[in-house]
Every structure is written in structure tokens, then in C-alpha cells.
Amino acid sequence: MSKLELYNIYAGYEESKPVLKDISFFVEKGEFIVLLGTSGCGKTTILNLIAGMIPISAGELYIDGVKSNDTPPRKRNIAMVFQNYALYPTMTAYENIAFPLQNAHYKKKDIDSSVKSIAVELGIDDLLERKPAEMSGGQQQRVAIARALVRKPSLLLMDEPLSNLDSALRNQLRFEIKKLHKSIGATIVYVTHDQAEALTLASRIILLSNGMIQQIGTPHEVFYEPANEFVATFLGNPKINLFTSNNLIA
């Protein structure tokens, strides 16, 4: 498990137009942090810079107390789960899950033990001989999560992993991810635009708009004690009603 710290981060895909502006937050070991906001607010960009896939223009990133701005992605011990599953279509579920261990030159018996163990934990042990085309979307996502977790990363990044699933399956996997987090105690940074998902899963929520943090807090804090009008109107269904007044009510 890793502790993550970001200080005054600026980043973007064009130097003159930063996507992220003065981003600062920390993630404690074993915490489940959800980055929440509308499309284009910068939440996936944060995930990508934590993983080392885009450079940091300014500011500092620390993983377990070590400055990691220029640390190559392969040396960060981070795993990532994507929206589109990203499974190898010609490989079975077993081979997909085993791939990162084979790439790291684990012994064959250790690979077999690790793959079967995580498969049982995620309820996919009966799918190990199937290829992705023979599995449902939910089953493929479980395999993708198993592949990410099998090498015991210190930090797990999840980029809208449930957004391609139907409502019923999304609810089921949401519960399973929460249960899995409790059982393995991993440090997780999770991206979503779905407020129900964020409020259900998060230890704390980081709510973003236009590349800037609007509020950081527990689900209870951001819902019942919004820091500004944006947070108040973004959360809740139906949305709250706003009105203007010239009088201050004591």
C-alpha cells in the first residue's frame, strides 16, 4: 500500500494551456479516493500523471515519501484498470491475469497459485479458460481487475471501470469493488462522473471542475456541507433550487 501526495500540480497536453491548475491533495495508505466531476474536468489527467503517462509541468508528486515526478511508470508499482477493459483478445482469462507475472519472471508455480487465488476472490475461477469474446462485459471487467491486482501493486488506479456496464451490473460490481477494497486494503484512486458511485465507494471525494479542486471531503461532508455553489448544484438528484436575495438571514 502506498501513500500519495500531490503539491501545487500543473499539467496539460499543451504547455500554454494547463488542464490541471494548482492541484494539491494526499491519499493515505489504504484509502479509497474518488475523483468526481464532469467530462473534461481533469480527473483522468490526474490519474495519468500519477501513473507517469503524462509529464508534470510544475509541482511535486510523492509516492511513499519519494519524489516521483520523473520516475518511469514501470518503476512506480502502480496498476491501472481502464474503462474499456483492455484485455488481450487471443488470450484466455487465465493468460490475461498471468501476463504481468510472466513479464516480471515469476516462477510458474507462483503464477498459477496467484492467478487462481485472485480468481476465487473475484468469483471468476470458472472463467479462466474462456477468451474475452466468450465473456460478458461484467466478467471481462472482473478479469481486468484481477490482472491489475494479481501482482499486488502498492497503488491501484481505476478509470471509470463500470461506465460501460448496465445499471444492474454496475450496482453489483460497485458492491464487489467496495468489498474487495476492505479485504485487501489497497490504496485506490478511482475516477468517475457518477455521483452515486462516488458517494457509495469513497473514503473521501475530490470534486473537480475546470481543472481545479472544488472540495475534498467524506461523502457526508461534500453532500451535506458543500463548499460552494458548484458542489451544491452538482451533487443530489433532483438538484437543489437556488434563489437570490438582497437580505441576509441570520
Regions found by a protein language model. Name each.
Residues 1-6, 11-22, 70-72, 105:
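A short, flexible loop at the N-terminus of ABC-type nucleotide-binding domains that lies
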Residues 36-38:
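The feature captures the beta-strand-to-loop junction immediately N-terminal to the Walker
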Residues 57-60, 210:
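Conserved coupling/switch loops of ABC nucleotide-binding domains, chiefly the family-specific signature
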Residues 59-67:
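Conserved ABC transporter NBD signature motif
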Residues 51:
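Helix-to-loop junction immediately C-terminal to a conserved catalytic motif
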Residues 227-250:
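ATPase nucleotide-binding modules
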Residues 76-79, 83, 87-230:
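ABC ATPase nucleotide-binding domains
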